[in-house]
From Swiss-Prot:
CDD domains: KH-I_PNPase, RNase_PH_PNPase_2, S1_PNPase. Keywords: Cytoplasm, Magnesium, Metal-binding, Nucleotidyltransferase, RNA-binding, Transferase. It comes from Kineococcus radiotolerans (strain ATCC BAA-149 / DSM 14245 / SRS30216). Its main location: cytoplasm. This is Polyribonucleotide nucleotidyltransferase. Signal peptide: none annotated. It catalyses: RNA(n+1) + phosphate = RNA(n) + a ribonucleoside 5'-diphosphate. Involved in mRNA degradation. Catalyzes the phosphorolysis of single-stranded polyribonucleotides processively in the 3'- to 5'-direction. GO terms for molecular function: 3'-5'-RNA exonuclease activity; magnesium ion binding; polyribonucleotide nucleotidyltransferase activity; RNA binding. Residues 586-648 form the KH domain. It comes from the Bacteria. Belongs to the polyribonucleotide nucleotidyltransferase family. GO terms for cellular component: cytosol.
């Protein structure tokens, strides 16, 4: 029996000292009834299948292209049984939804304009190595299955993840390698022929972020910070990898692709309609587009539109949809020409001007942290909630990440644009915007050990006219600081746009800072950049052009940095350091117990831990390494729970107010470490040593105490991480207390 005829090609990605990755594409074996199907292997360990199918009849009643992308994560791919009640896969995970968006964004603009047949791309993850991510692999296999389907599609499209590790851009990095990365980018593009006949990679989509460990790598280990220049170099570094992936896909398609079928297209309008609308509307529309306020401007634009439709009703009877579409195109052309010729935008701003900014914290009562950030008519409310680490999100996905301490949710109610609509579960767009804001802030969050809280951040888009996602980054920074979260640095975000066209025979580019919603819709690029004063923390780029010159992109990045620094200054006026934690927020402290004592703290069937929680009102959770997190609404309850835990697991654990004759074991520039008992040291700060030097200022610790010296000390404070702060007990204090105690004893 003859087997299926399989067509295959390989792309070999050379990462130098990091080795090679092999991506093998093949078709002809699986899902043969789909219009186009393709499979991909990553190093022979991970396997994805993509199938592209088109509806037989066009949906000519639609005024958009009905493309659907679905990603199916199969638990068997990772050797798991689903954790749901019915033990089968249910709704897609956040990771799957974000992958759908990564695929959709470069695929959608690559179809012929005017296509109205329903197109569905389904990517199934069927085998996955635990150290690999599947999202960029999915972009490539979805591109190939679509290229093979006979649809009018201008692919192939290559997608690559590159990470900056040890100063080198590494393609398709493993999760284990990403621990050493400072920046992580997903870049998608296609190969185009330039004006001089050479080939280049046109970047279509970028999704990038600084990693969770980037701050420590940069500050402590001297790693390269992801500045604008470094990011621009990374985009160039991605191009050869994309070209290799496109080459392999094209090799398969050259043999196995179906001929492009004749699909009916439905252009928005004919040239005669456009010309008539332009002549009838341009004068009034030009004036309407110069109105500053969004609501007033849109009201006037609608009035002009209705007048034009009435004027042309007889000449174009039955072609009302064409008139409306042509009116929108005239509006787009007028906006673009004004920007390129006069350097003036819809609301009268210059190209690099930012709308009026305002920032305010503590806007809601009782919540743990809140802030209101406004940029023009975009208004975002940020709200922070803190809780114990056991409330962090547990993830049942194919990736090795099983929990998430920082959760960012974004809500976009219909009233934010003055419209009615469905309210309920989040749409893909809301999930994507929340994920972008989350990635922008993760690099500056305090370490888990330093701030043992689960953090939920909610961004409410109360008003929308341009980049609510970047407004969410700003509002979230303010809200987190208001909640007392010790961020390593403040983060702000800005949305950039690009308009390009031929003016007087030459191609001109205009980068726009802080774009409006209309500039996003009518422009050629949506480029969101978030970061601190020092480096970039997140980027999202979508472009409708075949490619953006590197110089233009570098200029947009620099323009974005200038805007970001200005916004950070405005935010600093509202709050520039963490506030005291809200009285309604839980107080969380930690204590370390020996691993072999964990069972005693829990007790049979949880008896001991439940009793402590009942007696003190505190919540207690215990990690496998013996770290005990104690959370309570006030300090005394938390301290009572800590004392109860110590009584079981650390019976000799010191408490505040206890005195010891300790031994100096180490001196530093800021104080001396004193051993109170085996394995338990405390810090005697240099400011406290004045008591031992007759009240004189101490500049050198060794002038007062030396290693091996005995010192009488008292425990003044135990910080949330269990570290002890000591104060010296001088002879006069000790004798005075002894004298005061004698009459009581008599």
């Amino acid at each position: 029996m003859e087997g299926p005829e399989i067509t295959a090609a390989e792309a070999v990605i050379d990462n130098g000292s990091f080795g090679t990755r092999t991506i093998r594409f093949e078709t002809g074996r699986l899902a043969k009834q789909a219009a186009g199907s393709a499979a991909v292997y990553l190093d022979g360990e991970s396997f994805l299948l993509s199938a592209t199918t088109a509806g037989k009849s066009p949906k000519d009643q639609f005024d958009f292209f009905p493309l659907t992308v679905d990603v199916e994560e199969r638990s068997y791919a990772a050797g798991k049984i689903p954790g749901s009640f019915f033990r089968r896969e249910g709704r897609p995970s956040t990771e799957a939804i974000l992958t759908c968006r990564l695929i959709d964004r470069p695929l959608r603009p690559s179809f012929v304009k005017g296509l109205r047949n329903e197109v569905q791309v389904v990517v199934s993850v069927m085998a996955l190595h635990p150290d690999d991510a599947y999202d960029v692999v999915a972009i490539n296999v979805a591109s190939l299955s679509t290229q093979l389907s006979g649809l009018p599609f201008s692919g192939p499209i290559g997608g690559v993840r590159i990470a900056l590790i040890d100063g080198q851009w590494v393609a398709f990095p493993r999760y284990s390698e990403l621990e050493r990365a400072v920046f992580d980018m997903v870049v998608a593009g296609r190969v185009v022929t330039t004006a001089d006949g050479s080939q280049d990679v046109a970047i279509m989509m970028v999704e990038a972020e600084a990693t969770e460990g980037s701050w420590n790598l940069i500050k402590d280990q001297g790693a390269t910070a992801p500045t604008e220049e470094v990011v621009a170099a990374g985009l160039e570094a991605a191009k050869p990898f994309i070209a290799e992936l496109v080459r392999a896909q094209a090799e398969v398609a050259a043999t196995a692709a179906k001929p492009t079928a004749a699909f009916p297209t439905f252009p928005d309008y004919q040239d005669d309609v456009y010309q008539a609308v332009f002549e009838a509307a341009s004068a009034d529309l030009t004036a309407a587009l110069q109105i500053g306020g969004k609501q007033d401007r849109e009201t006037r634009i609608d009035e002009v539109k209705e007048a034009v439709k009435a004027q042309l009703a007889d000449a174009f009877a039955g072609r009302e949809k064409e008139v409306s579409a042509a009116y929108r195109s005239v509006q787009k052309a007028l906006i673009r020409q004004r920007v390129l010729k006069d350097g003036v935008r819809i609301d009268g701003r210059g190209l690099a001007d930012i709308r009026t900014l305002s920032a305010e914290v503590e806007v809601l009562p009782r919540v743990h942290g809140s802030a209101l950030f406004e940029r023009g008519e975009t208004q975002i409310l940020g709200v922070t909630t803190l809780n114990m680490l056991r409330m962090e999100q547990q993830l049942d996905t194919l990736s090795p990440v099983t929990r998430k301490r920082y959760m960012h949710n974004y809500n976009f109610p219909p009233y934010s644009t003055g419209e009615t609509g469905r309210v309920g579960s989040p749409k893909r767009r809301e999930i994507g915007h929340g994920a972008l804001a989350e990635r922008a802030l993760v690099p500056v969050l305090p370490a888990r050990e330093d701030f043992p809280y689960a953090i939920r951040q909610v961004s409410e888009a109360l008003g929308s006219n341009g980049s609510t996602s970047m407004g969410s980054v700003c509002a979230s920074t303010l809200s987190l600081l208001n909640a007392g979260v010790p961020l390593r640095a403040a983060v702000a975000g800005i949305a950039m746009g690009l308009i390009s066209d031929t003016v007087d025979g030459e191609t001109r580019y205009a980068a726009l800072t802080d774009i409006l919603g209309a500039e996003d819709a009518f422009g050629d690029m949506d480029f969101k950049v978030a970061g601190t004063k020092e480096f970039v923390t997140a980027i999202q780029l979508d472009t409708k052009l075949d490619g953006i010159p590197a110089s233009v992109l570098a200029g947009a990045l620099t323009q974005a940095r200038d805007a970001r620094l200005h916004i950070l200054d405005v935010m600093a006026e509202a709050i520039d350091a963490p506030d005291e934690m809200s009285p309604t927020a839980p107080r969380i402290i930690t204590v370390k117990v020996p691993v072999d004592k964990i069972g005693e703290v829990i007790g049979p069937k949880g008896k001991m831990i439940n009793q402590i929680q009942e007696d003190t009102g505190a919540d207690i959770s215990i990690e496998d390494d013996g770290t005990v997190f104690i959370g309570a609404v006030d300090g005394p309850s938390a301290e009572a729970a800590r004392a109860a835990v110590n009584a079981i697991a650390n019976p000799t654990m010191p408490e505040v107010g206890e005195r010891y004759l300790g031994t100096v074991v180490k001196t530093t520039t800021f104080g001396a470490f004193v051993s109170l008992m085996p394995g338990k040291d405390g810090l005697l700060h240099i400011s406290q040593l004045r008591k031992l030097s007759g009240g004189k200022r101490v500049d050198n610790v060794e002038d007062v105490v030396a290693v091996g010296q005995k010192v009488q000390v008292e425990i003044a404070e135990i910080d949330p991480r269990g570290k002890l702060s000591l104060v010296p007990v001088v002879a006069e204090e000790a004798s005075a207390e002894a004298a005061a105690a004698e009459p009581a004893d008599a």
